[in-house]
Amino acid sequence: MDEIMNKELALVEVDSISDALSTFIEQGTETVINVFTSNEAAVIWEAVTEVSADLVKASKVVTVIKKAASIPDKLFMNKMEKYCRGLIEIPANKRKKYAAKVGKPGLNKDSVFILGVLNKIEELSKIKILLTLFEAKIDGLIDDETYRRLMLLVDRTMYSDLLYLKANITDEPIVIENDAEQGLLANGWLYYYGQTWGTATEDSQLVYHYTNIAKQFCQLIEIE
């Protein structure tokens, strides 16, 4: 059994997983996701005729990796599965139109970046946010640079701090008063604005503003 698995793993190239995600972005459906997350996916695919050869290949790559995965790899595959399940909620015609626009190289570039972020995030709750940002990019609401910047900001910010950001975003200057605001400042959602005048009874205080990208994030994202 180990010998068979080693031979299967030898067929999985370094970029196979990004190719698989690119295929799911373009062609993924609920049936596809249910099959590729099954332990018997490679067998089930043999009886499925209404999917493309690319999808069959993508599913088998994922299946092989899942079988041989270490615990950290299994955690990563769990994040990828959750991402793919959310991905199919984006209308298929929208995904296919985007795929046609950027081509396979563009999809692969997206996939490599997404996988890098998924590999680092520790809170599964963030995955819904990542999907919302990807759909916003597909819809042309944000450009690629803004999309990537927001993805990286989300990656390094605690989910509870993102909840705080959404609930407390303001155009007014603020004084840092709690750990959430300190976290948002440290991770680039706030910038230094100036200092208040001190009085006989009160010391001067440093004040900060939410960044434009923080405001843009809050316009795009619904967090429950």
Where in this protein do the model-derived segments appear?
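Long, helix-rich, hydrophobic modules that act as membrane-proximal anchors or helical bundle/coiled-coil regulators
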Residues: 107-224
